[in-house]
């Protein structure tokens, strides 16, 4: 277990910005879907304007107050991503949902936490290892908000997800850099990406989220690659974080030295499958992290990784019981 005690002021924060948002209304006739996918032409998408650290701290021995606790669970979903967050205001957030084989596992994990509502669902990008289990999740819970990048693909997994969204009469909010999802009482969630609505590959359409609670900051990179990292740094966004969820499962296409130095994290979490076919994480990325003295926590080695923090304390632990859980 890793424990930290905060005894210094918060990292420098960005000035608050206000951005308009858009609601994406999907008008789909599923019976006419072809091999070209749900959105064979851009005219089939309708956008409607809407009102819509430095760390010198000693280890903590004090128990975190559950009523004011932020809990982040990096679920062990093999070669995929899924992060379940219980916010200190009682709301919940899910970032991605792994492959389809893990859908029921994710549903049970959320139910075991005592929640029946997901206030924020973030689908970073439409790759199967991020959206495969999402249909099962959407069917199992009350959903309030869904954020997705404005890109599409013709895969069956993506079409199944859109059909579930349609059948549940849910509305997608197109994600873009600068959106502030919430900001209250030292709690803030802001999107740093996507910036490009027509990326060369879907990884670079990924939603990147920065979550802050008091002086603790967390960065969730989806599968964003170095191209996106450069865009974010060019915009002079505040990327500093105590913990970064490494982009693209530790692929060498992500996690440039310049970006890691700007983030300056204590811990890097890598969501990755054991003995995966892609040889993730890349030895080059592991070397970069080690040379920058960033602790590495991997789901293939530890299982589900759980972070809890309040105003002054942060703890990291893992759930070995699910390390080799068959989904």
Q: What residues fall within each predicted segment?
A:
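Non-globular, low-confidence helical/coil segments that flank catalytic cores
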Residues: 2-13, 18-22, 27-327
């Amino acid at each position: 277990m890793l424990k930290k005690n905060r005894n210094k002021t918060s990292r420098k924060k960005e000035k608050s910005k206000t951005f308009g948002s858009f609601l994406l209304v999907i008008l789909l006739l599923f019976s006419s879907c072809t091999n070209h996918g749900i959105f064979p032409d851009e005219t089939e998408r309708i956008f409607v304007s809407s009102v819509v650290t430095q760390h010198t701290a000693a280890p903590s021995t004090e128990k975190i107050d559950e009523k004011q606790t932020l809990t982040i669970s990096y679920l062990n979903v093999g070669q995929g991503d899924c992060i379940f967050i219980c916010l200190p205001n009682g709301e919940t957030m899910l970032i991605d949902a792994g492959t389809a084989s893990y859908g029921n596992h994710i549903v049970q994990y959320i139910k075991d936490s005592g929640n029946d509502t997901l206030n924020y669902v973030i689908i970073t990008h439409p790759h199967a290892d991020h959206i495969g289990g999402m249909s099962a999740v959407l069917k199992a819970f009350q959903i309030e908000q869904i954020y997705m990048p404005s890109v599409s693909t013709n895969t069956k997994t993506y079409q199944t997800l859109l059909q579930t969204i349609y059948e549940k009469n849910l509305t997608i909010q197109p994600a873009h850099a600068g959106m502030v999802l919430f900001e209250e009482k030292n709690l803030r969630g802001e999107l740093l990406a996507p910036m490009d609505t027509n990326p060369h590959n879907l990884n670079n359409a990924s939603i990147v989220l920065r979550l802050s609670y008091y002086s603790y900051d967390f960065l969730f990179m989806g599968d964003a690659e170095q191209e996106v990292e450069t865009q974010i740094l060019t915009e002079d966004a505040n990327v500093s974080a105590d913990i970064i969820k490494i982009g693209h499962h530790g692929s060498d296409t992500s996690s440039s030295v310049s970006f890691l130095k700007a983030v300056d994290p204590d811990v890097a979490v890598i969501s990755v499958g054991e003995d995966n076919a892609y040889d993730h994480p890349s030895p080059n990325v592991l070397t970069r992290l080690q040379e920058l003295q960033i602790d590495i926590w991997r789901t293939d080695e530890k299982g589900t990784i759980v972070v809890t923090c309040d105003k002054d304390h942060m703890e990291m632990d893992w759930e070995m019981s699910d390390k080799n859980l068959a989904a």
